[in-house]
Amino acid sequence: MKFKDEIIIFDDFIEKDYQEKIKSELFGSREKGTEFPWYYIEDVTAAYSDESQHRPGLSHSYVDLPLEMTGDEDDILEPDSAGKVMSNYHKLFVPMLKRVGFKLGLSNVRVLQGRSFLQFPVNTDGTIDLPHIDILGKAEFIVALYYVCDSDGDTVIYNETKESKTYTINKSVTP
């Protein structure tokens, strides 16, 4: 893959009015009749699993990851496998995803998974979320991570790309 093991950061890569549009849609407004459909999730990193840290938040899925991409290293993936759009709000993020593709020199960007999380400020003891892998198996993918507002800490990116007993930090990114 062209960007294997690279961490590329684009600061302020979308226009301010587009940033505000995303923020306005996600936060909604009762006065304007625009309530965004957030759904409770028990833990944004490892919900309902033994690894859960029980850090609740709200979640919204735009594109559902195909089942065959949630498996283990021996899974065989179809080359045209792509996620199913589950939310009308997906189109809100398409211009940003196209911009990511453009900045990376990619002419065709397929979305395998799209989701948003609204985390509550429960990380008051300085601990960080457990390491996790966004897509298991043999899929080659790029993660486009966008912060709508301040976060409760850095995003930690590890060297390991498979489940491991120990993890070493590659980079810590302050949003």
Question: What do these predicted ranges mean?
Answer:
Residues 75, 79-175:
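Catalytic core of non-heme Fe(II) oxygenases with the double-stranded beta-helix
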